[in-house]
């Protein structure tokens, strides 16, 4: 472990994790400073005191020192050596002190001016490739030529002088390339390609075990993964840490040596794993410490570098002193930490860690660590599915409870929702609940008494009565409630929802400690550690102290459920008229009827087969395309059993699995079914069948109960016939693979080492890469990675699972997908069918993969249809409903304009008005197709730059202040008030989008963002005078993610990130305005540069009176 702290005080109904994370950085920095001071002064570090009582204010220099030490500490572990080089020359910029010893360079000639031999500094400035054999140097040059350099790791190199082998693990930093060199044993099987692939096969077997587990049990999933990691790595103890919403951690699964103390159930404060460390785990998902007692090695670097080398992604980065001290205190010498990353709503989220500890030094070779990382990626996908399923079940339960409560409100007294079952306690997890209505109080479970509830309600009315969303807090003490202490540990957290000015629903939670148990919590007299010593037991004690007077936090889904019930209650008690008039109901019924008729027409005329069954498996839907394929008319198909009368015997098990899952609410994608064909008089034709690739989709009634299953498919009969023929041919596979027949699907093959051994003509046409370019290349990383860029990490993981399952001889699920971009940037999605080829001994020597392109244009994907329709409805609703508040804002603007206001107030009003016009343009005038094609209608009006500047800055000021970041603005005085002509709102839209993305990706806290605008040459044209303007949006740090920039600048279909799509449209819009944008990375900063020619009525020298910006 290391360091971390937590807190979540009172809040409204929507949590703000960004603020708590920022505050957490300050707490972590304070602990770091305390520890560093203790080392400097020789005094003991009191861990518990520092965690329990962090300072209220942390100096900026402490935070800077903390982040710098974490990222640029200048020390590496001694089990390998590090070399940093310049690109593309490979000139050495820095290296670890032990490099000469590792590479056997003791006889290197002197390069120092003094003539004294300095075996380390003497290496700075030379070509690093000369330290290795010629073939090793060539391998390093090849790796450096690829954009995604890490995909080729590890590069096997040999020292020129000793011929010793090393794993070279490469990554890019701001200064160049960092090479972590880890010694490899000459006889190690992992040195060979076959040995490295064998590690992946071991991981795939572990993944297969994860996939075979029954759903709905996250505990079993965690238990299995710790067993698999322990089996792969051999550590004495392997645990799963889960990070909770308030950032504290918990050991939720463990496998250990029998003589070791159990940590299962241990909770520890957030400071034990700092925010900076968590950020690094998302960047570098495997972290190994070989020996915490070993003395770190210093990194020596060239004097031309302005700051220490960034070691964030270095496999050798030395652990911090407090971390090694903690490990030593718990009896651990070596550790391996593996990040568990899942997708959040907006970005990836560090859910937890799998951590191995060993009681003696332990080194795990890179190929095996890479296999563990692969296992973690697959585990993350499986965990994400389980979390989504659990969330869906919880949401459905909440909706059912809300429905029952609403029914009670309609036919019973209001107190029934507390006194009857189910009641409001069933809506969310809580220890007690209360209803305060018209001065009376109803209580259930563990609650304050009536007078205390009344006092709490009065405090809520006085202090939070204006908050339309209610109040949630995990600590009434921190929320400032005066009577919190008197409630004791029984009531610490509360969720309050007011449904009128003085009527409230309240849910209560008790102290966190009451729900937490750990077998190691009891302090034994023999134990030597005291409260101030860093140890799991003191972590647990510190956590309980930090969590004192605090309950478990309220989850967002729970807050949403409470908020929904509050709205229902408010409507029930304030509405004195029917919700809908008779005319309204009739109109809505007509609209619904029209919508249903249109959907029936779309389904019936679709070019994809669509059919459905009721809950008993009998057909109740059969469109025209399905009838054409099978020869069975809809009138004859209705009522037949899909499993017994339509589907072929070999597909019956797959269908029954689909139906079982769908009727439980779990939908599947890309499952192959074989359907019978029917001849005259509707008799089955047993000599032929049709193959469809289907997606299942649940059908529900108005109460959300599942009443059937719909299947949306794609006809793959001809492709399946070719695959079957290929299997029959067995050894004579070249007949099909080398055929130029356009009906042959894309096919590629892998040898036993995951290298490409076949790539047919259809594959060449699909990907744009010729056979000679890919044959012999590694399929993972090179072919699918460097050549065919994979859509995202999840897509790559799914492909790797299918690939290694195929070459390991395991069955590859027919629903396996591969998603990538071809050479021209076109997005490809295909299902994979695998067929292995074995030698006479039964060993797999080759595996063929057949691609079936998922044609979304010719078919209707039911889940996607639902999702698209829902998204369209949401968008239509937002665009419509936002107009009323916009009209209100516009009316308020008009009133203010006509009143007496100061000049500065008028300037703020103009900024607000410009923001309102920007929103109006987005919702009323946005035509994405016209933007893509460069045909959007541009408007013309007179404007000044200072007004645009005020407007775009106002849109990022809140986030800048939250992050404690500075804004630096440099605008040439002569152009601030220069009258310009053009589409002001669209230029404002473009600049605001660029600035927002710059702000979102600037490091924080205590960083800065810059804007500069400078004039260029004036031009004269037939239609007037123009001035060239250059805008720059600047921020320090590593820059925007490559996926986002690819979305913005590459001319491919589709997009990976929503922000990338927005930037792409901004670029297109700017190009239509005869402007251009570029993104520039420099050593210390990155920036967007916009060059634009704007029409002006006056020259720069004859500008009007200067103004000043209202935002500084």
Swiss-Prot record:
Arranged from A to Z, the UniProt key words for this protein are: Chromophore, Photoreceptor protein, Receptor, Repeat, Sensory transduction, Transcription, Transcription regulation
One example GO MF annotation? photoreceptor activity
Q: Which top-level group of life is the source organism from?
A: Eukaryota
Where is each Histidine kinase domain found?
877-1096
What are the start and end residues of every segment in region (Disordered)? 1-20
Limits of the PAS domain: 595-666, 732-803
Spell out the post-translational modification annotation for this entry.
Contains one covalently linked phytochromobilin chromophore.
Q: Where is the GAF domain?
A: 217-387
Q: Which GO terms describe its biological process?
A: detection of visible light; red, far-red light phototransduction; regulation of DNA-templated transcription
Q: Does the keyword Transcription apply?
A: yes
* Ligand binding (phytochromobilin): 322
- UniProt-listed CDD domains: HATPase_Phy-like (cd16932), HisKA (cd00082), PAS (cd00130)
Family matches, as InterPro entries:
GAF, GAF-like_dom_sf, HATPase_C_sf, His_kinase_dom, HisK_dim/P_dom, PAS, PAS-like_dom_sf, PAS_2
List, alphabetically, the PROSITE patterns matched: HIS_KIN, PAS, PHYTOCHROME_1, PHYTOCHROME_2
Q: Name one Pfam family in it.
A: HisKA
Give an example GO cellular component term for this record: intracellular membrane-bounded organelle
The UniProt subunit note reads as follows: Homodimer.
Please report which protein family the annotation says this sequence is part of. Belongs to the phytochrome family.
Q: Main role? A: Regulatory photoreceptor which exists in two forms that are reversibly interconvertible by light: the Pr form that absorbs maximally in the red region of the spectrum and the Pfr form that absorbs maximally in the far-red region. Photoconversion of Pr to Pfr induces an array of morphogenic responses, whereas reconversion of Pfr to Pr cancels the induction of those responses. Pfr controls the expression of a number of nuclear genes including those encoding the small subunit of ribulose-bisphosphate carboxylase, chlorophyll A/B binding protein, protochlorophyllide reductase, rRNA, etc.
**The protein's name:** Phytochrome E
Give the organism, scientific name. Answer: Arabidopsis thaliana (Mouse-ear cress)
């Amino acid at each position: 472990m290391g360091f971390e702290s937590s807190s979540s005080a009172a809040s409204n109904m929507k949590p703000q994790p960004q603020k708590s994370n920022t505050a957490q950085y300050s707490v972590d920095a304070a602990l770091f400073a305390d520890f560093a001071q203790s080392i400097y002064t020789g005094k003991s570090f009191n861990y518990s005191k520092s965690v329990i009582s962090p300072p209220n204010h942390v100096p900026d220099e402490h935070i800077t020192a903390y982040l710098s030490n974490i990222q640029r500490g200048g020390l590496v572990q001694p089990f390998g050596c590090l070399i940093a080089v310049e690109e593309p020359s490979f000139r050495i910029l820095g290296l670890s002190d032990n490099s000469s010893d590792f590479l056997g360079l003791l006889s290197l000639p002197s390069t120092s001016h003094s003539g004294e031999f300095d075996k380390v500094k003497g290496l700075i400035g030379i070509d690093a490739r000369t330290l290795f054999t010629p073939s090793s140097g060539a391998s390093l040059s090849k790796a450096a030529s690829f954009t995604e350099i890490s995909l080729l790791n590890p590069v096997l190199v040999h020292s020129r002088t000793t011929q010793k082998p090393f794993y070279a693990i490469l990554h890019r930093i701001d200064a160049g390339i960092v090479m972590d060199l880890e010694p490899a044993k000459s006889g190690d099987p992992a040195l060979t390609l076959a040995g490295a692939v064998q590690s992946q096969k071991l991981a795939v077997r572990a993944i297969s075990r994860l996939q075979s587990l029954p759903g709905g049990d996250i505990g079993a999933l965690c238990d299995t993964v710790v067993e698999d990691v322990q089996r792969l790595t051999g550590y004495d103890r392997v645990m799963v840490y889960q990070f909770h919403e308030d950032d504290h951690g918990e050991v939720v699964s463990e496998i250990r040596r029998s003589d070791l103390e159990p940590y299962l159930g241990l909770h520890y404060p957030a400071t034990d794993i700092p925010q900076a460390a968590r950020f690094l785990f998302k960047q570098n998902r495997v972290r190994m410490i070989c020996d915490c007692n070993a003395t770190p090695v210093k990194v020596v670097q060239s004097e031309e570098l302005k700051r220490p080398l960034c070691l964030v992604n270095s496999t050798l980065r030395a652990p911090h002193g407090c971390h090694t001290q903690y490990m030593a205190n718990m009896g651990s010498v070596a550790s391996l930490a593996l990040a568990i990353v899942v997708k959040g709503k907006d970005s990836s989220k560090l859910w937890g860690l799998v951590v191995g500890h060993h009681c003696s030094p332990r080194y795990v070779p890179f190929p095996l660590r890479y296999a563990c990382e692969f296992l973690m990626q697959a585990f993350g996908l499986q965990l994400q599915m389980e979390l989504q399923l659990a969330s869906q079940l919880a949401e459905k339960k909440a909706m059912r409870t809300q429905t029952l409560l609403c029914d009670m409100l309609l036919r019973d007294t209001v107190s029934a929702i507390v006194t009857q079952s189910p009641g409001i306690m069933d809506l969310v997890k809580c220890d007690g609940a209360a209803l305060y209505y018209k001065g009376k109080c109803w209580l259930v479970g563990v609650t304050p008494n009536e007078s205390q509830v009344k006092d709490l309600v009065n405090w809520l009315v006085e202090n939070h009565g204006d908050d339309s969303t209610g109040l949630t807090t995990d600590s009434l003490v921190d929320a400032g409630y005066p009577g919190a202490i008197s409630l004791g540990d029984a009531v610490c957290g509360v969720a309050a929802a007011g449904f009128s000015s003085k009527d409230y629903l309240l849910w209560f939670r008790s102290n966190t400690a009451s729900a937490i148990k750990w077998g190691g919590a009891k302090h034994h007299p023999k134990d030597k550690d005291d409260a101030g010593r860093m140890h799991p037991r003191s972590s647990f004690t510190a956590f309980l102290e930090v969590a004192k007077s605090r309950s478990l936090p309220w989850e967002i889904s729970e807050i949403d459920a409470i908020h929904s019930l509050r709205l229902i209650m408010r409507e029930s008690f304030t509405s004195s008229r029917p919700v809908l008039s008779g005319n309204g109901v009739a109109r809505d019924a007509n609209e619904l009827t029209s919508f249903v008729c249109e959907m029936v027409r779309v389904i019936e005329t679709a070019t994809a087969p669509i059919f459905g069954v009721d809950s008993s498996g009998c057909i109740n839907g059969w469109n025209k395309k399905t009838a054409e394929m099978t020869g069975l008319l809809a009138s004859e198909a209705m009522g037949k059993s899909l499993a017994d009368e339509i589907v072929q015997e070999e597909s019956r098990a797959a269908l029954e699995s689909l139906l079982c899952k769908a009727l439980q609410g779990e939908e599947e994608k890309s499952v192959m079914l074989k359907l019978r064909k029917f001849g005259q008089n509707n008799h089955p034709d047993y000599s032929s069948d049709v193959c469809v690739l289907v997606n299942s989709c649940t059908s529900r009634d108005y109460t959300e109960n599942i009443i059937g299953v719909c299947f949306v498919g794609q006809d793959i009969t001809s492709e399946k016939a070719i695959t079957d023929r290929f299997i029959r041919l067995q050894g004579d596979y070249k007949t099909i693979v080398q055929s130029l027949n356009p009906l042959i699907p894309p096919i590629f093959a892998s040898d036993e080492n995951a290298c490409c051994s076949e790539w047919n003509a259809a594959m060449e046409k699909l990907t744009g890469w010729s056979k000679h370019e890919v044959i012999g290349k590694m399929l993972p990383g090179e072919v699918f990675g460097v050549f065919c860029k994979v859509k995202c990490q999840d897509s790559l993981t799914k492909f790797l699972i299918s690939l290694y399952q195929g070459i390991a001889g395991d069955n590859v699920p027919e629903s396996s997908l591969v998603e990538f971009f071809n050479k021209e940037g076109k997005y490809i999605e295909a299902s994979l069918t695998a067929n292995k080829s074995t030698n006479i001994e039964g060993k797999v020597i080759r595996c063929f993969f057949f691609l079936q392109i998922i044609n979304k244009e010719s078919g209707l994907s039911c889940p996607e249809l639902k999702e698209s329709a829902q998204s369209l409805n949401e968008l239509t609703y937002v665009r419509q409903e936002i107009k009323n508040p916009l009209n209100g804002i516009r009316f308020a603007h008009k009133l203010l304009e006509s009143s007496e206001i100061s000049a500065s107030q008028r300037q703020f009003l103009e900024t607000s008005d410009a923001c309102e016009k920007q929103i109006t343009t987005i919702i009323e005038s946005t035509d994405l197709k016209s933007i893509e094609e460069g045909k959007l209608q541009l408007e013309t009006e007179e404007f000044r730059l200072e007004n645009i500047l005020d407007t775009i800055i106002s849109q990022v000021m809140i986030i800048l202040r939250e992050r404690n970041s500075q804004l630096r603005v440099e605008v040439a005085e002569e152009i601030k008030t220069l009258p310009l002509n053009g589409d002001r709102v669209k230029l404002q839209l473009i600049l605001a989008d660029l600035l927002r993305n710059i702000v979102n990706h600037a490091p924080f806290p205590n960083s800065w963002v810059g804007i500069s605008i400078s004039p260029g040459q004036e031009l004269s044209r037939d239609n007037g005078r123009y001035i060239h303007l250059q805008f720059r949006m600047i921020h320090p740090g590593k820059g925007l993610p490559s996926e986002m920039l690819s979305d913005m600048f590459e001319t491919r279909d589709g997009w990976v990130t929503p922000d990338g799509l927005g930037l792409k449209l901004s670029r297109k819009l700017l190009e239509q305005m005869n402007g251009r944008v570029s993104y520039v990375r420099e050593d210390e900063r990155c920036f967007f540069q916009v060059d634009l020619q704007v029409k002006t009525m006056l020259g720069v020298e004859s500008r009007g009176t200067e103004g000043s910006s209202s935002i500084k």
